[in-house]
């Protein structure tokens, strides 16, 4: 039997307002940090912010295809507000990631998300290098459709 109806990815680019999302979800301190993150991610990716799903502020996009054949689109870089924490999307581990993480400051790293409470706890130059490394690695892995 042929399975033609692929499951649709939940996280897709939308027309929702980035500013409205931040206004609704962020504390005052988080709002200031979001402003800095937005400038950093726009500078690194050379893309304007777009909402991806209901809760990710994403920049740029790339198309991926798994060995299973499932494919989709995702932002090259992004961030989200998760309660009292901010998270930055680092989809791909660049060559320098482990060394950079050791110099970053107070954070937790998940599979593809970097969690922290405030930018003041982090070395922002290192954070920018982490994002740039992840974006470069995504473009290297997906050269035919890197969203550039």
Model-based region annotation:
Residues 1-148:
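Charge-dense, helix-prone N-terminal extensions
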């Amino acid at each position: 039997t042929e399975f033609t109806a692929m499951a649709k990815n939940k996280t897709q680019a939308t027309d929702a307002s980035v500013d409205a999302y931040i206004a609704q979800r962020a504390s005052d301190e988080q709002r200031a940090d979001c402003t800095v993150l937005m400038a950093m991610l726009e500078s690194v990716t050379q893309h304007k912010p777009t909402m991806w799903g209901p809760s990710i502020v994403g920049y740029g996009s790339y198309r991926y295809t798994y060995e299973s054949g499932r494919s989709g689109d995702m932002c090259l870089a992004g961030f989200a507000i998760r309660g009292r924490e901010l998270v930055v999307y680092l989809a791909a581990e660049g060559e320098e990631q482990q060394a950079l993480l050791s110099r970053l400051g107070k954070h937790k790293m998940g599979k593809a998300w970097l969690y922290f409470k405030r930018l003041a706890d982090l070395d922002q130059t290192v954070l920018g290098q982490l994002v740039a490394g992840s974006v470069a690695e995504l473009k290297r892995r997906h050269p035919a459709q890197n969203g550039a």
